[in-house]
């Protein structure tokens, strides 16, 4: 067996580990699971650390398991939260589970023989257990004192903790015990905030099944500036292209700070230690070229999305930073085009105007209600100075007839000066 724990150590992915875990893994092919919250139809980059733990676990010859918390997701884990979550319907949870499964197939091999990955949903066993039965079989094994001592409970006591949330660690512990008995699972992994819940499981296994199980956690990532990893100014960075475009996804990684990127490339790629150290040496010679950031962004964008999406993100970046040609602009799909130019003025125009063959001067002044240029005089002056382009083609004459192929048969991109863009949409 490859040494899974050593792999996590050099990558900076190990926080806490129960004594005996490393030795057990070296001697036994083991099944380990990580729980995923199905309260959304997509995972976020905040889930990537634990996903990568499962990836390394599988590469070490072990069996990775993803548990979708269909039952516990109806309640919500109080760990790291200051308020109670909203409950979700079973139908919504099932839809979310399917979305999560599709995303995990990009990282884990579910059909590779003896150590194929597995996916389970804890609703499948909890739905058949009655409240009295659960109290009798599981509740009697953990004392209230034991449960109250957990950090996830302590931190919420001052602001209020419902009995439902208080029971969460018992439910998660029961998951571990169920999987220990039915699926031969011996290890649960998660973020460091899950240590209390995971060890509740090992304790329940000891008491209910007279068995020994193990726990391992990874650090909760923060960025060098102290902010939480996994979010941008606009909110969550999702793995689903419909929620976060591949362009924005790529840009998030490309914008990693120099103080963060060495950690990130160890955690989020499968590059070897030697390859990473060689890249770091090369990066140090010319940090402004951002070699580490580009390598990281390429690797993770291709894995989560596709090579085509990565190429599209590159073209989109070049368009914004002035290195592109018209062909690059025409190659963008609508999702990328709108993502790249999100926030710029989007001006709706009747398509019939094009049949009248207007001049560039008219289009950029009166026909766009003076939104691009307030007057024809100002438009004429900037065009004469070479400061206006349409679809990356410089306008040489204000009397030129508008006869440019529409992007995606709908749009014209107007650039005024170096930084001012306008998107015209013809309806």
UniProtKB/Swiss-Prot annotation:
Renumbered ranges of motif 'KMSKS' region = 228-232
Q: Which residues bind L-tyrosine?
A: 33, 168, 172
Q: What is its EC number?
A: 6.1.1.1
Q: Which UniProt keywords apply?
A: Aminoacyl-tRNA synthetase, ATP-binding, Cytoplasm, Ligase, Nucleotide-binding, Protein biosynthesis, RNA-binding
Residue stretches making up the S4 RNA-binding domain: 361-427
Q: Where in the cell is it found?
A: Cytoplasm
Disulfide links within the chain: none
Q: InterPro entries recorded for this chain?
A: aa-tRNA-synth_Ic, Rossmann-like_a/b/a_fold, S4_RNA-bd_sf, SYY-like_C, Tyr-tRNA-ligase, Tyr-tRNA-ligase_bac-type, Tyr-tRNA-ligase_bac_1
Q: Does the keyword Aminoacyl-tRNA synthetase apply?
A: yes
A Gene Ontology molecular function term for this protein is: ATP binding
Give the multimer and partner information: Homodimer.
What protein family is recorded? Belongs to the class-I aminoacyl-tRNA synthetase family. TyrS type 1 subfamily.
Role this protein plays? Catalyzes the attachment of tyrosine to tRNA(Tyr) in a two-step reaction: tyrosine is first activated by ATP to form Tyr-AMP and then transferred to the acceptor end of tRNA(Tyr).
The identity of this protein, by name, is Tyrosine--tRNA ligase
Organism in which the protein naturally occurs:
Cytophaga hutchinsonii (strain ATCC 33406 / DSM 1761 / CIP 103989 / NBRC 15051 / NCIMB 9469 / D465)
From the UniProt record, report the name of the gene that encodes this protein.
tyrS
């Amino acid at each position: 067996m490859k040494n899974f724990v050593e792999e996590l150590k050099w990558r900076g992915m190990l926080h806490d580990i129960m004594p005996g875990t490393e030795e057990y893994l070296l001697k036994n092919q083991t099944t380990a699971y990580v729980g995923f919250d199905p309260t959304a139809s997509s995972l976020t980059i905040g889930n990537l650390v634990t996903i990568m733990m499962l990836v390394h676990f599988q590469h070490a010859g072990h069996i990775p398991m993803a548990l979708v918390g269909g039952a516990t997701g109806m309640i919500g884990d109080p760990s790291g939260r200051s308020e109670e979550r909203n409950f979700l319907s079973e139908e919504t949870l099932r839809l979310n589970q399917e979305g999560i499964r599709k995303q995990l197939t990009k990282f884990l091999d579910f059909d590779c023989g003896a150590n194929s990955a597995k996916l389970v949903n804890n609703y499948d066993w909890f739905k058949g257990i009655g409240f009295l039965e659960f109290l009798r079989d599981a509740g009697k094994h953990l004392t209230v004192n034991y449960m109250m001592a957990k950090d996830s409970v302590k931190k919420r006591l001052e602001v209020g903790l419902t009995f439902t949330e208080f029971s969460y660690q018992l439910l998660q512990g029961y998951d571990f015990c169920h999987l220990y008995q039915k699926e031969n699972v011996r290890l649960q992994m998660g973020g460091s905030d899950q240590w209390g819940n995971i060890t509740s499981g090992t304790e329940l296994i000891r008491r209910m099944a007279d068995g020994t199980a193990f726990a391992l956690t990874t650090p909760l990532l923060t960025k060098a500036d102290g902010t939480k990893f996994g979010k941008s100014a606009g909110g969550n960075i999702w793995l689903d292209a419909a929620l976060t475009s591949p362009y924005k996804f790529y840009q998030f990684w490309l914008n990693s700070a120099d103080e963060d990127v060495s950690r990130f490339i160890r955690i989020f790629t499968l590059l070897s230690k030697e390859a990473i150290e060689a890249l770091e040496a090369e990066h140090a010679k010319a940090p402004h070229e951002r070699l580490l950031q580009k390598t990281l962004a390429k690797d993770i964008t291709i894995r989560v999305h596709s090579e085509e999406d990565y190429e599209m993100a590159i073209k989109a970046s070049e368009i914004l930073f002035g290195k592109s040609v018209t062909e690059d602009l025409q190659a963008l799909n609508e999702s990328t085009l709108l993502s790249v130019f999100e926030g710029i003025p989007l001006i709706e125009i009747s398509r019939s105007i094009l049949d009248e063959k207007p001049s560039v001067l008219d289009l950029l002044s009166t026909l766009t209600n003076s939104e691009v240029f307030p007057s024809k005089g100002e438009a004429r002056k900037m065009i004469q100075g070479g400061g206006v382009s349409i679809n990356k083609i410089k306008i040489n004459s204000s009397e030129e007839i508008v006869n440019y192929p529409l992007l995606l048969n709908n749009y014209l991109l107007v650039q005024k000066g170096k930084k001012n863009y306008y998107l015209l949409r013809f309806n």
